[in-house]
Each structure stands twice: as structure tokens, then as C-alpha cells.
């Protein structure tokens, strides 16, 4: 609040099932008032949907959070179609916000999940530090661990599992496609960062030098060798891949 001694706190709230809303909380009267809520057309009723937080064990023992949302009745004890989203870079948090475009998928029985992999800051600064530079591969192993956990829990199966990532999340999709193509039916990499080595070796590209802090400087052999282990473009091989949209 801009007024320090105000008795009213104004805040916003959203979740995977709750459209963004602005609230005023009266600290003296202990009352809550909705000031504004984003309109959702089509008769949306959030009581028809459920959201959960799960945790998947990573290979090194870290517990990776997963946010999921689905329409009630979608989990019937048999694997469902599931779309798994991931990013995991720059310390950015993949917030479980309300996304209107997901309603159509949920209404058709699709489960939507966000893998809060290392490289983001969902669990604090250390979560970011453990997903960059020489620890970047944690981002990919975390995502694979989340996918495996969702399959093990019976929420989905490899023939019904799709994955999506954008930009640096597209790097995640490309790396995971090379590492575990058998785990997914389809993968979407939107504006993906897939040619890591050549991009980071070209200082004429505006963002290259400042991004050494995120990926490392491939002009140094240790970084070059490590980046080569996951750069999607450099690890494509003769194997059966999921259906890909790039």
C-alpha cells in the first residue's frame, strides 16, 4: 500500500482455477471485499475444477514441485491426456496463474501440469543457482523426473503425455527430447533456444555476452564441453522422436 498507516490492504490473487481478482482486506474489521475480478466468458464455474501440488523426486534427491489442474472427474483411475509445461531459466518463476485458454483442454479431459524445475526461483535463490552454468542439466533431469512421476502416479502414460516450453523453455524441450524421447507422445518448442554453442560463441548477437552468467562462456573449454552435453542441436541423433512442433 502507498498509504503506510492505512487499515486496508489491497492485493491480487489468482490460481490455476481462479481468475485474477483484486481484493481489499480491512485489517480492523477483518473483512474481505472483492473489488474487481477478471471476466471469463462461457459460464465458467471454478468449482468444477481442481488444482493440486505434487512433488517429484529428482535423481539427486531434490523434490521438484508440480502444479496440476483438471476438471473434476478427469482422474478416473486410468491415464489421462496430460500437457506438461516447463521453463527453468533466469531465476524466473513459472507461476500457477489462471489461463483462460486452458479451459477448453480441461473440459475435454486433459490434465495440465507445470513442472517447477530448477533454474527458476520457485523454491528460493538456491533453486535458481542449481539450474544454471555447470548445474544446468538439473533443469532437464528435473523435468524428466516430473514426467516419470506423473506416469508412475497413473495420471498419464507416455502415449498420452505432451510437453511444452517457450524460448529457454524450448531449450528444455529440445534437450529432454534428445535424452528421453520415449517418455513423450508430442512436444512443442516455441521460439526455442536450441543452437546453444554457436549462439553463445557469437558476441555480435546482442544478448550473447550478458548471458554468459546464465549458460557460461563456451570460449572456455570447461563450459564448452559441458554445454555440448545438452545443446539440443548438437545432440540430435538417429532415434525415434516424439511428434515435434518447433
Map each language-model feature to its residues.
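A fold-wide structural signal in alpha/beta-hydrolase
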Residues: 82, 106-116
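Serine-hydrolase catalytic-loop signature spanning alpha/beta hydrolases and amidase-signature enzymes
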Residues: 88-92, 112
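Short strand->helix junction
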Residues: 73, 91-92, 120, 133
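Short beta-strand segments enriched for Tyr within beta-sheet-rich domains
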Residues: 80, 110, 183-185
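Conserved hydrophobic/aromatic pocket- or pore-lining residues that grip, position, or stack substrates
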Residues: 22, 56, 66, 84, ...
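Non-catalytic accessory segments flanking enzyme active sites
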Residues: 1-78, 92, 97-103, 107-108, ...
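Glycine-rich His-Gly loop
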Residues: 14, 85-89, 167-170
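Active-site-proximal cap/loop segments of hydrolase catalytic domains
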Residues: 114-246
Amino acid at each position: 500500500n502507498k498509504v503506510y498507516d492505512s487499515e486496508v490492504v489491497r492485493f491480487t490473487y489468482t490460481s490455476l482455477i481462479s481468475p485474477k481478482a483484486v481484493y481489499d482486506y480491512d485489517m480492523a474489521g477483518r473483512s474481505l471485499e472483492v473489488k474487481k475480478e477478471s471476466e471469463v466468458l462461457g459460464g465458467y464455474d471454478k468449482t468444477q475444477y481442481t488444482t493440486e501440488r505434487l512433488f517429484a523426486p529428482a535423481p539427486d534427491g531434490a523434490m521438484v514441485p508440480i502444479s496440476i489442474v483438471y476438471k473434476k472427474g478427469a482422474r478416473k483411475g486410468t491415464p489421462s491426456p496430460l500437457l506438461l509445461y516447463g521453463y527453468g531459466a533466469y531465476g524466473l518463476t513459472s507461476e500457477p496463474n489462471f489461463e483462460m485458454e486452458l479451459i477448453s483442454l480441461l473440459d475435454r479431459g486433459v490434465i495440465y501440469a507445470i513442472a517447477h524445475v530448477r533454474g527458476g526461483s520457485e523454491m528460493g535463490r538456491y533453486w535458481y543457482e542449481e539450474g544454471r552454468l555447470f548445474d544446468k542439466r538439473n533443469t532437464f533431469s528435473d523435468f524428466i523426473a516430473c514426467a516419470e512421476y506423473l506416469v508412475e502416479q497413473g495420471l498419464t502414460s507416455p502415449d498420452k503425455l505432451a510437453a511444452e516450453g517457450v524460448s529457454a523453455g524450448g531449450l528444455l524441450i529440445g534437450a529432454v527430447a534428445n535424452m528421453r524421447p520415449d517418455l513423450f507422445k508430442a512436444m512443442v518448442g516455441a521460439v526455442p533456444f536450441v543452437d546453444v554453442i554457436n549462439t553463445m560463441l557469437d558476441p555480435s548477437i546482442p544478448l550473447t555476452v550478458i548471458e554468459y552468467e546464465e549458460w557460461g562462456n563456451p570460449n572456455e573449454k570447461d563450459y564448452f564441453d559441458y554445454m555440448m552435453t545438452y545443446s539440443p542441436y548438437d545432440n540430435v541423433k538417429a532415434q525415434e522422436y516424439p511428434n515435434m512442433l518447433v
